[in-house]
């Protein structure tokens, strides 16, 4: 998790849930994620399984098992390609951004869709929802 449980369940605009089933592993957190969605948070589920939270998800990306890295690279490719990045944050607080940018340049949504066996447009929409949210934990 990238934030406190409270931040995720009470302060989020979008939640990116990757390979996790909080309703079974942490039922209270799972219930709070569902409540966050009911309050208006967007939910993106990235999981090959049809977990219960998929019913409330705005997007469910059913990745082929073992393709999480390609998915992450594809998300980064879209963030960069569509200029959905915080340039000042990158300049002030990151290192080797250009190397990462070079690494993900070939991970187009179409290539990632083929690798992960998902829809390229849904991947784009997931990236846009996540990148445009003010508060978006993973």
Report each predicted region and the residues it spans:
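Cofactor-pocket helix-loop regions in the catalytic cores of large enzyme subunits
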Residues: 1-138
């Amino acid at each position: 998790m990238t934030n406190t449980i409270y931040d995720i369940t009470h302060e989020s605009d979008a939640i990116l849930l990757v390979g996790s089933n909080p309703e079974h592993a942490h039922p209270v957190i799972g219930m709070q994620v569902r409540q966050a969605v009911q309050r208006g948070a967007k939910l993106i589920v990235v999981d090959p399984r049809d977990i219960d939270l998929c019913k409330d998800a705005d997007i469910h990306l059913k990745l082929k098992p073992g393709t999480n890295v390609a998915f992450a690279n594809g998300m980064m490719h879209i963030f960069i390609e569509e200029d959905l990045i915080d340039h000042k944050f990158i300049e002030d607080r990151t290192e080797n951004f250009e190397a990462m940018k070079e690494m993900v340049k070939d991970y187009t949504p179409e290539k990632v869709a083929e690798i992960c066996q998902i829809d390229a447009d849904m991947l784009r929409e997931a990236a846009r929802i996540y990148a445009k949210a003010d508060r978006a934990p993973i």
